[in-house]
Structure formats: C-alpha cells, structure tokens
Amino acid sequence: MSSEYQIGHEGEFTYRGHTLDELQEMELDEVAELLPARQRRTIKRGLSVEQEKLLDEAREAGEEETANNPIRTHLRDMPILPRFVGLTFAVYNGQSFERVEVEPEMIGHYLGEFQLTRTSVEHGQAGIGATRSSKFVPLK
C-alpha cells in the first residue's frame, strides 16, 4: 500500500498526487474526494455550525499571523484540511488547551489525533502497606 503523502524528487510535498498549492486552491468538495472515507463522509454529510465557524476563522487567520494567537477550539472531530496548513490551533484535551501546529503531513487526520486526552500513568515504588507482604517490612 502506498502512502497518502510523499515528498517528491524536488522535495515538494504531494498528497495523493496533488501539490500543497493545488490542494489549497481546490474547493471543499474536491478536497473531500481525496480524503480517507471517514473524513470524506464527515464533509459530505455537511459540517456542523461550529465546524463552519472554525473554517471561517481559519480563512481569516490565513491572512494574518497566528503564531502568537492560536485558534482556540473544542472541535477535536474536525478533519484537517489543506487550508489549515501553517496555522496554529489550541485544541482542548478535556483539561486545557494545547497547541497544535498544522503541517502538510497532517492533512486527512482529525485535530484530536494530535492532542491526547489521557496520559500514561507512571507508578512509583510501592509503599508500606501497598501489598500484604509489605506490612511487616521493617522501616529503614
């Protein structure tokens, strides 16, 4: 199976045979045809009001500099579109807003995939009384 995106022989990014500039000039329906099935279905069924607002914010922010002022959103289920490349989003992970800088390789994924909601637990050493056998261990 070939990958969805490639770096061409000139070092130019392509997504399913289209350069980034070509992708950014396409309409939303044309881009949807290139996306994976789940993301394509999301767009074909119609974006929600909140997702439409996020698209408008991204369109406005594309003309401005957003490095210092990321676009804040709770929409973890928003597919990453070519017009988002280069923008910075602050995606809510259930506790705080974390920065996600969109790169060309992220096209076709969801915003939430790049901001995890759970952290892995790193347990320390067991203490006194943690197990039945440790109740009678003498203290140092």
UniProtKB/Swiss-Prot annotation:
InterPro entries, per database record: Ribosomal_uS19 (IPR002222), Ribosomal_uS19_CS (IPR020934), Ribosomal_uS19_euk/arc (IPR005713), Ribosomal_uS19_SF (IPR023575)
Example GO biological process: ribosomal small subunit assembly
MF term (GO), any: structural constituent of ribosome
GO cellular component: cytosolic small ribosomal subunit
Keywords tagged on the record: Ribonucleoprotein, Ribosomal protein, RNA-binding, rRNA-binding
Gene3D superfamilies given in the database record: 30s Ribosomal Protein S19, Chain A
Function: Protein S19 forms a complex with S13 that binds strongly to the 16S ribosomal RNA.
Xref: PANTHER family: RIBOSOMAL PROTEIN S19P FAMILY MEMBER (PTHR11880), SMALL RIBOSOMAL SUBUNIT PROTEIN US19 (PTHR11880:SF2)
Family: Belongs to the universal ribosomal protein uS19 family.
Protein name: Small ribosomal subunit protein uS19
Organism of origin: Natronomonas pharaonis (strain ATCC 35678 / DSM 2160 / CIP 103997 / JCM 8858 / NBRC 14720 / NCIMB 2260 / Gabara) (Halobacterium pharaonis)
Lineage: Archaea, Methanobacteriati, Methanobacteriota, Stenosarchaea group, Halobacteria
